[in-house]
Amino acid sequence: MVIEEWKKSGIATKFPTYRNSALITTHSWQKGKRQDDGAEGLWRINDGIYDFTSFIDKHPGGPFWIRETKGTDITEAFEAHHLTTAPEKMIAKYKVRDAAEPRIYTLTLEEGGFYKTLKERVREQLKTIDKRPKKKSDLIHLGLVVSLYLLGIASAKYNSLLALVLASVALCWTVIVSHNYFHRRDNWQMYAFNLGMMNFAAWRVSHALSHHIYPNSYFDLELSMFEPLLCWVPNPHIKSKLMRYVSWVTEPVAYALAFFIQMGTRIFYSLRHTNILYWHDLLPLTIPIAIYLGTGGSLGIWICVRQWLAMTSIASFSFCLIGLNAAHHDPEIYHEGDANREDRDWGLFQVDTIIDRGDLKWSQFLVLTHFGDHVLHHLFPTLDHGLLPALYPVLYQTLDEFKGHLRECNHIEHMIGQHKQLLRIEPNPRAPGAGK
C-alpha cells in the first residue's frame, strides 16, 4: 500500500487508522490501534506476542492498564512504566509466540541506548534520594481539593467574584495535580481529576498511552482531538490557511469550553456508539451539591448549578492556558513532518518533542500545578513530580553523551511559540541533534 506523502509518519510505517474516524475519541484511537499494531488480539512487546488474560486482575498497578491495552503494541508503555527489572523477567511465562509481522513503530529501545542507559542510572539514583517531597505532593493535592469546595461555597454564599475566581483556579490546579497520580497504580487522588468534567480513565488512554508514548505525532490524541479548531502539525493538508488564523480567534472559546466538550463528546459517543462513561463521571456533581449544602440550601439549586458551571468554565480556560503552553508546541521542537534525528531512541524522541518551563523549577508547588519538569515526567511518568528534581544530574550527564538537548523557556515565550506553531505549515528540515 502506497502512503500519500503528507501522511507519512516520522515514527511509524503507516498512517494511524483512528485518524480516519468521523469522531475521534479514546475508543476510536484504541480501536484503530488494535487494527494497526499487529498484536494479533493479544498484547505485543517488541516482536513477541503475550497473553496477559490471567494476569489482568493480578496486575499491581490495577486491571485497567492491562485490560485496556489488549490487542495493541505496548512496548514503549511497558518500558516507561516499569523502572525495576522484575516485570521484564516476569512476563517471559506469558509469551505465546513471536509476532507474525514487524512492528509498525520505528522508535527503538536498545540496550546501551539513551533511554535504557538513563533508566539504569535513575534506578540507582532512586535508592538514595530524599522521598519526603512525595508526601509534600500529597499535601498540596489534598489542600487544593479542600480549598476548591470551600471557595466554591464562599463564592455563592457571599456572591463574591474573587472567591469564584479563586475556586476556579483551585479546581484547575486540582485537575493538573491529579494528573500526577493517574499515571500510577490505582489511588484515590486520581479520582479528583474528574472534578473538572474530564475523566482519568479516558486520560489514561489519551494522555498516558497516546500522548506520552507518541508526542507530537499522528498517533498523539492530544494533537488530533483539538483539530480543526487548533492544529499544531505543520501540514497544509491538515490545517487550511483560513484555520491557521481563525485558530487565534477560536482559541479562547475552545479553552473555556474544553471541559464541557470532553464530557459532551463522551456522552454523545456513548449514546451513538459504545459506552465510554463510568460511575465516576458523576463526581463533578459533588461541587454544586457541596455548594447547596454549604449554603444551607438557601440559594436554590439553579444558583448553585450556575456557580458550578462558571467555576468549571474558568477552570477550563485556565487549564488550557497552562496545559497547551506547558511543554510541547514551539517551532523549535519536533512535530510530525519535521526531520527526525538519526538516533531513533524513544527517549531522545521524547526530549525532542518537549520544551520545558525553566521558570518553574524553584517551586514544587508550581511544578505540580503547571506541568513542570516535563521531560523527566515523560521519561518516567510513574514517579511523583516531587522526586524529579533529584534526577537532573543523571539526565544532563546522559544527554551530553547522546547529543541530546534540554530546551527551556518561560511561560510568555512558550505562549508566543505556541501561536507561531499554530501558523507554521513548513516542516523543519534540520533534525534535532544535527548541529548548526
From Swiss-Prot:
Residue ranges occupied by any Cytochrome b5 heme-binding domain in the UniProt entry: 16-100
Q: Where does heme bind?
A: 59, 82
Query: Record's GO cellular component, any one?
Result: mitochondrion
- Keywords from the named record: Heme, Iron, Metal-binding
Q: Which GO terms describe its molecular function?
A: acyl-CoA (8-3)-desaturase activity; heme binding; metal ion binding
Q: Does the keyword Heme apply?
A: yes
Q: Name one GO biological process term.
A: lipid metabolic process
Expressed, tissue-wise, as follows:
Muscle.
Q: Which Gene3D superfamilies match?
A: Cytochrome b5-like heme/steroid binding domain
Task: List, alphabetically, the Pfam families matched.
Answer: Cyt-b5 (PF00173), FA_desaturase (PF00487)
The record's listing under InterPro entries reads: Cyt_B5-like_heme/steroid-bd, Cyt_B5-like_heme/steroid_sf, Cyt_B5_heme-BS, Cytochrome_b5-related, FA_desaturase_dom, Fatty_acid_desaturase
Q: What does this protein do?
A: May play a role in muscle cell metabolism.
What is the protein's given name?
Cytochrome b5-related protein
